[in-house]
Amino acid sequence: MSVPQAPAKANQKRRIGALALVFLGCVVGVAVGMGVYTFDYAEGMSYMSNDPTACVNCHIMQEQYDGWQHGSHHAAATCNDCHVPVDLLGKYATKIEHGYRHSKAFTLDDFAEPIRITPSSLTVVHNNCIRCHGEYVSQIISHSAKDADAVYCVQCHSTVGHGRKSGQ
């Protein structure tokens, strides 16, 4: 009499399932480990602070940081005052989005040189200009709000936050 083969097939399926789980666990473990290592190596927690030196963890921002130190806003504003929304949720959502985009671009060496501001970041900067300087520009704002070709503050005042770039 022959031995039934059903238990052997069940054992084989269990073994394959266990190996697949071990393999998946290893892949997830390596991915998480690499993410934690990269976050630590890039001093990721510093990006959650208001310290402007966090912006120069990445060498590509050194020129902007140096310009800010010598610029007119150094005594009054940090990077976050201009580059992230004021509300808590918007602030950290923007920091996460910027951190992801910057780390991806830095890792893949996919930065435009010199670094350029994105349209969404330009809107945040403009809104923060208005938040601090609204009383001085109220007539301009009310006029440009009706204009289909509204002008962002930094289109004319491009050197205010980071100082003059070489050659300007």
Predicted regions and their residues:
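Short sequence/structural segments immediately N-terminal
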Residues: 2-168
